[in-house]
Each structure stands twice: as structure tokens, then as C-alpha cells.
């Protein structure tokens, strides 16, 4: 068997580490060509020692020099690259068959798009790629024969329970709606009057999942679910009015598909990202993920409730941006990234995140942008507007 050759973008984050855990269980199936780890040099050096990639990519020359010194000390022959173009290069290299796109934020868009242009199998964990450039990205993938496999647990769950020949045809397959589940985050039952006193340390403590700081805050505001709605719209060619969100605090049911005949098919499992990663990497096989069996005896109850937009205004804003279309999702994402960064840095209150996003969505912006240059320019304009607004909140 010829192993699949992988580039893993965001290898030092939680998705990247989970991916490498799955890869390590199947050395005969996978070979790592490149790892990208931004600024976590020590962790990336350890990964290079274990997986021996041809290339490792970091953010800049300073971190590249540090990584080179560590690799030289340990006798690891991996070549070190740095910068945005290096991410594009390792994502589109001829040797590579599959790319794990797990860089957080819109900064992951150019490398994901480069992989699509080269017809790679794309394991998509970077939801911002589709939020910012859904039409452009999916059309690029289709035109170049790139397979886009969803790694996000919710979209992966939907992918697993849809007919294999689904290909975006809802009506033909009798699909009434797609239902994304959400845990509700750490503040599902907290007093709304305390929200303006929520600290970054509290917001990053997710009750069920192990995630990075940014996505943990997005889960706490439910912006994460809003971004996932937009992602599902593009991934599954699903109209906004056929997308539902239900809060399911136990995070056992990862998503559902409602069919016209009254059936609802769901995918269940322990909340561990290695399950969707292994499903994508192993297709069409089911391979060992390292995740334990779901213990039904230990489940006391599975509960569900509708999301409350007063508690989660970011989810409402995401619905509005999805329905508006055009550049609105790009604006939504850029404003949210700027606001979450400011919150984590202690510059604004938790409740100011939604205020910042609402402010930016109220500004004038182009209805539609058809190329990556225009999208990145809109992203930059919105971030500047968000930073200016944040300055008035301090």
C-alpha cells in the first residue's frame, strides 16, 4: 500500500495534535510531508523528531532560526521555511495528496485555496475558509477536482449520515433540514447580569471539548455555531432556511439530518476530535482513532433546547450575515476575530464582542467579492473598523 502523503497546517494546535495522534496509529497508511506550527517552536521541533517531515513552517525568520537550532541539536534533517508563502508552497506541493487545514482564522484561507487549486484532498478544519470565501472556495475545489472533507465534528457528523452520493441534492434525497448541535458552552445557565464580568480564563474553559483559546471563546458566545451554519450552507449546498441549531449540552449527538418521511438520522460518539479526523483520513475505510467506546450506561440523559438569542447575540448576527450573503460573512468573521483577540488580551468585556461585530456589520461594504484579493481587502478594512470601535470601548 502506498501511504497517503500529508501536509498538516496548524500541527501544534489541538486539531493538529489530534491528527498526528491518528497518523501515529497507522504508519503504513500515512507519511507526513510538512508540518506548520506558527510560533510554537518547541512543540513543532518535537513533532519533527517524531514524524520526520521534509519541511516545517513557522511564522517568521526569528522563529525559523530558533527551530533550526533545535532541529540541528537533535540531528533532525527537516528543512525549515517561514512566512505565508511557505504555507501555500507546502499545501500545494506536487508530492502531497492530502492537506489538513487546521490553521485558526482567515489567515488559513490562502493555503487552503492553494490546495484546492492543485486538486488535493482537503481535510477542512478551518471553518473561516468557507465563512469568508464559500462560493470562491467551493467553485475552485469543484473546478480542480479537489475533495473537501469536513473535519469539524458537526459537519463530519452530517457528512456521515448523508447518502454517499448526496452531492448537494437535498430535494432529490428527501432531506428536509440539517440540524447542527451545540453544547451551549460554559455560560448556558449563567445569570445574564454577570456576562459583562466574564473573564478570559472563564470563557476558555469548555465543559466538553479540548480546544484552542479562540474557538473556546467562540463557543462561549455561540459565534462558533454561527460560523458553522455558514460553513454548512456551503459544504452541503443547503439553503439557510433548511439549517437548524439545537442546544445539546452533553455533546454526544454531534449533528442530525431530518428527512422528509419524518426520520432523523444522527451521529453519536464521545466528544473527541480524533473520531472525525480518523473518519476523513481513512475514507472509505473505518480506521482506529484511539477514541474509547461510547458508554451508554454512563449516560444519564440527553437533553435539547432552542438557543436564546438574548443570551447568544452572536448567533443571531451570524444568521443575519448568512441570510444577507455577499461580503457579510467575511465582515462577520473579521470583526469577531478582532473582538475575540481584544477580549483575550483584556481590552474589552465579553459582552463587547457582539457589540463590535454588530457595529462592523452596520458599516457600508461591498455586496459581493469574487476573488481572494477583494476578500482579504475587505477582511483588512473590517479589522481596522473593529479596532477603531474597540478603542472607544476602553
Curated annotation (Swiss-Prot):
- Disulfide connectivity? none
The highest taxon in the source lineage is Bacteria
Q: What cofactors are annotated for this protein? A: Mg(2+); Mn(2+)
InterPro entries in UniProt: DXP_reductoisomerase, DXP_reductoisomerase_C, DXP_reductoisomerase_N, DXPR_C, DXPR_C_sf, NAD(P)-bd_dom_sf
Molecular function terms in GO for this entry?
1-deoxy-D-xylulose-5-phosphate reductoisomerase activity; manganese ion binding; NADPH binding
Among its keywords, does the record have Cell inner membrane?
A: no
Where 1-deoxy-D-xylulose 5-phosphate is bound, by residue? 127, 153-154, 183, 206, 219, 224-225, 228
**First-tier enzyme category under EC:** oxidoreductase
GO terms for biological process?
isopentenyl diphosphate biosynthetic process, methylerythritol 4-phosphate pathway involved in terpenoid biosynthetic process
Protein's UniProt keywords contain Nuclease: no
Q: Which reaction does it catalyse?
A: 2-C-methyl-D-erythritol 4-phosphate + NADP(+) = 1-deoxy-D-xylulose 5-phosphate + NADPH + H(+)
EC nos: 1.1.1.267
Functional note: Catalyzes the NADPH-dependent rearrangement and reduction of 1-deoxy-D-xylulose-5-phosphate (DXP) to 2-C-methyl-D-erythritol 4-phosphate (MEP).
Task: Supply the name of the protein.
Answer: 1-deoxy-D-xylulose 5-phosphate reductoisomerase
- The record lists the organism as Neisseria meningitidis serogroup B (strain ATCC BAA-335 / MC58)
